[in-house]
Design a protein with these regions (language model features):
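N-proximal low-complexity "stem/linker" segments adjacent to membrane-targeting elements
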Residues: 1-49
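A structural alpha-helix within SAM-dependent methyltransferase catalytic domains
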Residues: 41-44, 48, 102, 128, ...
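C-terminal subregions of glycosyltransferases and related glycan-biosynthesis enzymes
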Residues: 263-285
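Acidic donor-binding segment of Leloir-type glycosyltransferases
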Residues: 47-87
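Short aromatic/hydrophobic "clamp" motif used to bind/position activated sugar donors
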Residues: 110
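Short, structured coil/turn linkers that connect adjacent secondary-structure elements
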Residues: 63, 98, 114-115
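Acidic/His-rich active-site region of diverse nucleotide-sugar glycosyltransferases
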Residues: 5-15, 26, 87, 92-99, ...
Length: 285
């Protein structure tokens, strides 16, 4: 943390979400916000209510927003207890915010979650069991669903133009290997995260850093899996105000890092024929 960064732990006397202090967290959850509204409190309330007996810690990295500089902090101070808040001096983006958050965590397992997800009862233990099992994946994620229960994604891929396509076929309760999954909700062992090098801040401010991360995992012999028996609601596009950022710089970074993208990935026509859904047909993430 630089000298200009700010850090504090919330202590609301009447919290909507409370996380008990622990000296030995099993899972450290990292959340990156940027002018985020009340959805982050709803997410934290659902998280606090569903982690059960698992010792956890929560770190929120609040990137400064030019128009809403105090919005997230005010909400967290009012409605939470036991949440560590880190406020960097400048906007680090998603990747940089995640990495700053990781540096303030102690758990053996890292959970990266968006502020606009909602967790159901019983979601965490099955994902941890996958990481504890034989031949575990490097990354495990739930199926993301819309509020009406429609499958939003059970893993994703990119076509050769770098357009994202979501697998919307219901996997049932199966654990399926995927090319990558949205980092809206991931679990990964800290040792693996450190080994792979974490998220690349070159994808500032956001988008494609989860693709790059998962592709590095795959290049090094690891894999990403989605647990079909775990469904998490993702209020797509509600975590950050304003328009999504331009993707020109991030696309250039991805294509420079993975020049084989244009020749090895499937065509849009192939994915459409196989029943995948293009991100161009969906609201912003």
């Amino acid at each position: 943390m630089s000298d200009a960064d700010e850090l504090f732990v919330t202590a609301s006397p009447a919290p909507v979400a409370r996380f008990e202090p622990t000296t030995a967290p099993h899972v450290s959850f990292v959340v990156v916000t940027y002018g985020t509204g009340w959805v982050v409190i709803e997410m934290l309330a659902s998280l606090a209510a569903t982690v059960g007996s698992t010792p956890v810690e929560v770190v929120v990295v609040d990137n400064p927003h030019p128009r809403l500089p105090q919005r997230v902090v005010s909400e967290l101070l009012l409605a939470t207890a036991g949440v560590t808040v880190v406020r960097p001096a400048s906007n680090l983006g998603f990747a940089g915010g995640c990495e700053l958050g990781v540096r303030h965590t102690r758990g053996t397992t890292l959970g990266f979650v968006n502020p606009d997800v909602v967790f159901p009862a019983g979601w965490l233990d099955p994902l941890l069991a996958v990481l504890d099992g034989a031949d575990p994946p490097t990354i495990v994620a739930p199926v993301l669903i819309d509020p009406d229960g429609t499958i939003q994604e059970a893993g994703q891929t990119l076509d050769r133009t770098a357009t994202a396509w979501a697998n919307v076929t219901d996997p049932g309760d199966a654990l399926i290997d995927v090319e990558y999954a949205s980092a809206a909700c991931w679990l990964v062992r800290r040792a693996e995260h450190d080994r792979i090098g974490g998220f690349d801040p070159a994808y500032h401010p956001a988008y494609y850093e989860d693709v790059d991360y998962a592709w590095r995992v795959r290049r090094d012999g690891g894999r990403t899996a989605v647990h079909g028996g775990v469904r998490v609601v993702h209020h797509r596009g509600s975590g950050t105000p304003g328009r999504p950022p331009s993707l020109d710089s991030q696309l250039a970074t991805l294509r420079a890092a993975w020049p084989q993208l244009a020749t090895t990935q499937p065509s849009p026509e192939e994915l459409a024929a196989a029943g995948w859904r293009s991100s161009r047909q969906l609201p912003a993430h």
